[in-house]
Amino acid sequence: MVKLPLPPGTFPTLWNADKRYKENYMTNYEGYYQTYDAGHIDDDGYIWIMSRTDDIINVAGHRLSTGAIEEVLSEHQSVAECAVLGIADKLKGQLPIGLVVLKSGVDKDNETISKECVQMVRDKIGPVAAFKVVIVIKRLPKTRSGKILRGTIRKIADNVEYKIPPTIDDPAILTEIKEDLIQHKILNNG
């Protein structure tokens, strides 16, 4: 949340959606703008935005924060950045999968890193997360401002039609993600 008034340079509304803007961002807590971001301030005073508070998945009736799972994955010594998303599952509703980008110079094999990441989530969050899949990828699709395109990745994984966002940094990454999901049998090739 950000205390009002908003600083110069922030948008006072959404294009053609002033009412929706006020309902979604200005009415939850009087005098504050609701960002739906979660983060922390480190010892040096830097603000770290870690996840969205509205990115909750439903795994067999349990509401889980993908941000909490991402936080665990980011603690792995070989992980540079990651994204967790819930993919559709007929039995459990959704299942979390992790996509991780490794730091340069990592000499462990991808399978070992994936197993270690799965075990870390099991140890810190518990078996209720049903977290069993970590895919090591080269890079994550992002907007030019650095936001990871989780919604687009989720649509690709669920084999749902998606549009390439106009703000994407490099559209070729989406093809790479699709190929990785097919290779790991998350997405059906046909």
Q: How should these model regions be labeled?
A:
Residues P5-P7, P12-T13, R20-E23, G31, ...:
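AMP-binding/adenylate-forming catalytic core of the ANL superfamily
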Residues R52, I137-R139, G151:
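Short, loop-centered acidic/histidine patches that primarily coordinate divalent metals
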Residues A83-V84, I135, E161:
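Residues embedded in well-ordered beta-strands within globular domains across many folds
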Residues V134-R144:
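Short proline/glycine- and acidic-rich turn/helix-capping motifs at secondary-structure junctions
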Residues E161-D169:
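A short N-terminal helical cap/helix-turn-helix that marks the beginning
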Residues E179, L187-G190:
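C-terminal low-complexity, glycine/proline- and small-hydrophobic-enriched intrinsically disordered tails
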